[in-house]
Amino acid sequence: HTADYEAQIVLQNCFLFYPFTRKIDFRVVPWATFTEPEVARVGLTEREAREKFGKIKTIKAAFDENDRAHAEGETAGFAKIILHKKKIVGASIVGLRAGELIHEFVLAMRHNLSLADLNKAIHVYPTLSKITQAIGTKQTLENLKSPFTQKWFARYLKFWH
């Protein structure tokens, strides 16, 4: 798949001129290993991100929190994203159909979408892709616990009472 991606860009650059030429963006090339369980990844690992940026944030959702995984009887595994200043810099999935689930994170990284942007997408229920939304929901709930948000809500409630 990487060779196909590279070939597409080479062909485009051969036949088009600036500003229509493109550079290869290796940070968004996914990979998957079709083992039992499947493993898929895009971008930086947690260790690579810490080395590059220092302060990062990881958010993880387990497959045993996903109703479709329960229906399939495959609840082992997780999805994890790595954020640097709210930007998705990596994602890893271990579990059922990880190679297919990674694409939502590839798209987000390619187009600089935030986790909040991904969370706004409507996901069919019950599907394994709801694990992406579960990560977004965890981030939203964490944001609600921040001192700034709690202070804002306290002022808001005080205003209306």
Feature names for model-found ranges:
Residues 1-26, 127:
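Rossmann-like dinucleotide/flavin-binding elements
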Residues 15-18, 29, 34-45, 50-161:
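Flexible, glycine-rich terminal cap/loop adjacent to redox cofactors
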